[in-house]
UniProtKB/Swiss-Prot annotation:
Extracellular side: 24-139
Stretches of the chain found on the membrane's Cytoplasmic side: 161-489
Protein name: Inactive receptor-like serine/threonine-protein kinase At2g40270
Biased composition (Polar residues): 99-116
Domain topic, free-text comment: The protein kinase domain is predicted to be catalytically inactive.
Region spans: Disordered: 67-130
Gene source species: Arabidopsis thaliana
Keywords: Cell membrane, Membrane, Receptor, Signal, Transmembrane, Transmembrane helix
A GO cellular component annotation in the UniProt record: plasma membrane
Signal peptide start-end: 1-23
Top-level lineage group: Eukaryota
Length: 489
């Protein structure tokens, strides 16, 4: 929602800027028009003044200035006539005078007309002033082009951010050249038909879990996935409370995002046929429980066990430092999966508030005797797992020492850990007793007296010298490769 609001504000600001550009363009055009009009008016005034001066000089040169003056002979005749008889009417002026004047002034008229002809450089009154039409083109093109480009950018950002929080579908199984964590912007919704094809029509069953059956799937790219399918097959058996747990589980798993965690990659929900499925990263080397307690499984040496312990510690420390902290709900050796290079992948297939009841209904065989609800419970479970990895003995709890083995009670009473080491281990570190002290601090009866996972991780790193990078899977099937997801329209 926040992305949409930001995009909308950016879009409004862009429109406002575009309107300002258009207004600026109109003002610039009006200014150019007024400038051309002013030039034209000034030119017209100059031409008018020039023509007036030209007319005045022309009239002055054409007129004979001596036309009205009497000649000497006329003055003499007038004197004689005045002395003899007064004339009743004045005699007209002799024609030769005006003729002479006309004769004299005609060349002057022609000469004056030729002399005052306007110069070629002077602007003519009737010739229009050419307008500089090219001066406004760059301004208009720049404003329109820039506004159009920014409009495209804003539109693209709006549609991109509006889809950022949505789930995506369908799921293309190809690989791209760059890592992308699909759970960063939302867990994708996958089609049942795609999962069905990857799991060979759900025939490749690899086990069971509190959710239901666990399948192995292989994408067209060769990437392997783990598919956990809920046992419920009808909508009437799927309660509203169960749906709430389902969505909370997806939300919780999507926040973990750690290299030593079996991350959630997608989920499927369909009405016909009724389907609820979770898709996880797959670790091909089975569980820690199998390697510790089944002779047929690959033997884990001392270095491999320490690496598994450190990967688990780093993952739990990451989960506990989230806001709010996330505690693993079923932290046992059967929930720790191993990759090709025997790095740990912490899986969490538990579901609902009562996992024991879920397991009974689904006839599953996974260990669910511990249901941790807070980080302090995870610290206790981590201490039990450390003891199990070193001794090879399965211990349920300090409160149930007779259920499997009493060695844990003996250890807590002062027995050295070196005397309890798994007999299949050919060698082990001399600092094993230091690890024993860490185990004892994790198994304190009062949860408030137990150390934090951050403190435990720091102690073990100092003892083993293994960094987070040392405990990270080197060939993680989906961490270094990306599942390319196409968003729906």
């Amino acid at each position: 929602m926040l992305f949409k609001m930001r995009s909308f504000v950016a879009f409004v600001l862009l429109l406002s800027w575009f309107g300002s550009c258009c207004s600026l363009k109109d003002q610039a055009v009006d200014f150019l028009k007024s400038e051309d009009s002013l030039k034209k008016d000034l030119s017209s005034d100059e031409d008018s003044t020039y023509l007036k001066a030209f007319g005045f000089h022309r009239k002055t040169l054409v007129r004979n200035p001596y036309k009205d003056l009497p000649s000497r002979k006329d003055r003499k005749n007038r004197v004689v006539a005045a002395t003899t008889t007064p004339s009743s009417s004045p005699e007209p002026a002799p024609k030769h005078v005006s003729t002479k004047a006309s004769t004299v002034s005609e060349p002057q008229k022609r000469s004056s007309t030729q002399d005052v002809s306007p110069s070629p450089s002077a602007p003519l009154a009737n010739s229009p002033i050419p307008r500089n039409s090219h001066s406004s083109v760059p301004l208009v093109v720049g404003c329109v082009g820039g506004a159009f480009f920014l409009l495209l950018v804003a539109t693209g950002l709006y549609f991109f951010t509006s889809k950022a929080g949505k789930t995506v579908n369908p799921w293309r199984t190809g690989l791209s050249g760059q890592l992308q964590k699909v759970f960063v912007t939302g867990i994708p919704v996958l089609k049942r038909s795609e999962i069905e094809a990857a799991c060979e029509d759900f025939s490749n069953v690899i086990g069971s879990c509190p959710i239901g059956k666990l399948f192995k799937g292989t994408l067209s790219s060769g990437v392997e996935i783990a598919v956990a399918s809920f046992a419920t097959t009808t909508a009437k058996d799927w309660k509203d409370s169960t749906e709430i747990h389902f969505r909370k589980k997806i939300e919780m798993l999507s926040k973990i995002n750690h290299k030593n965690f079996a991350n959630l990659l997608g989920y499927c929900e369909e009405k016909e046929p009724f389907t609820r499925i979770l898709i996880f990263e797959y670790a091909p080397n089975g569980s820690l429980f199998e390697h510790l307690h089944y002779k047929e499984s690959e033997h884990l040496d001392w270095g491999m066990r320490l690496r598994i312990a450190m990967g688990l510690a780093y993952c739990l420390d990451h989960m506990h430092q989230l806001n709010p902290p996330i505690a693993h709900t079923n932290l046992v050796s059967s929930s720790l999966q191993l990759t090709e290079d025997y790095a740990v992948k912490v899986s969490d297939f538990s579901f609902g508030s009562s996992e024991t009841e879920t397991n009974i209904n689904n006839n599953t065989v996974i260990d669910t005797h511990i249901s941790a609800l807070n980080p302090e419970d995870n610290i206790y479970s981590f201490g039990l797992l450390l003891f199990e990895m070193i001794t090879g003995k399965l211990i349920e709890s300090v409160n149930k020492p007779d259920s499997v083995d009493s060695s844990l009670v003996d250890f807590l009473r002062g027995e050295t850990l070196a005397k309890m080491v798994d007999p299949t281990l050919e060698s082990y570190d001399a600092k094993i007793e230091n690890i024993g002290e860490v185990i004892k601090s994790c198994l304190r009866t009062d949860p408030k007296e137990r150390p934090t996972m951050q403190e435990v991780t720091g102690w073990l790193r100092e003892i083993t010298g293994l960094s987070p990078n040392d405990a990270t899977p080197k060939l993680s099937p989906l961490w270094w490769a990306e599942l390319e997801v196409l968003s729906t329209a």
